[in-house]
Amino acid sequence: MLYLAEAQSLTTASTDLTDDSVKVHTEIPKVEEKANPIPLPEKNIKQTEKTTDTLPSIEYDIEKLPAPVKMMRQKIIDAAKTGDVNNLKPLLGTSGDPTQLSVSDNVKDPITYLKQLSGDGDGLEIMAIMIDLLNSGYAHLDQGDDEEIYIWPYFVALPIDKLSKPQLVELFQIMTAGDLEEMKEIGTYSFFRIGITPDGTWRFFITGD
């Protein structure tokens, strides 16, 4: 099991990679919406809940994923299992449409950034987190519109204080009970999550509320 507490203890010095110091923690600095061109899933979930009481569908069956999504998921897992974070680089989008790794969207070197997020400094911890997330259940959000996304883990789409005991067991595979209590204070799941669009684009790997 990977512990968020270890990731939270990581604070790196300011570098030329981002405008601010790179830190791994549960919360993300609040930024203006215009600074974040990729809509975050929580915003869409809250908007949906205003008009319907229906929760997003939760799935475990990988075969139900569209072929491009299933392929990208497997590519991320395979790259992470190599133990070399550089193998993720071809999957992280292009300079014109990069995978979002930070809410402020100011990451200049994604591989170095991922290494700095990782407690070991080589990206191994971060890759293990990716594998754990992609082996969990997923949610299908915003079906049929331009922001449609498949997101791991599905906890992002559910009220964090309403999880069943079996769901909590799943949650504790990627974080601790102490982390859960902190998230209850925030009111939402705030650990890492991965989003892949229906066409197989790796849209984001971010953390925060």
Annotate each predicted stretch with a short phrase.
Residues 76-88:
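Short helix-adjacent coil turns
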Residues 4-15, 29-73, 89-209:
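C-terminal-biased regions
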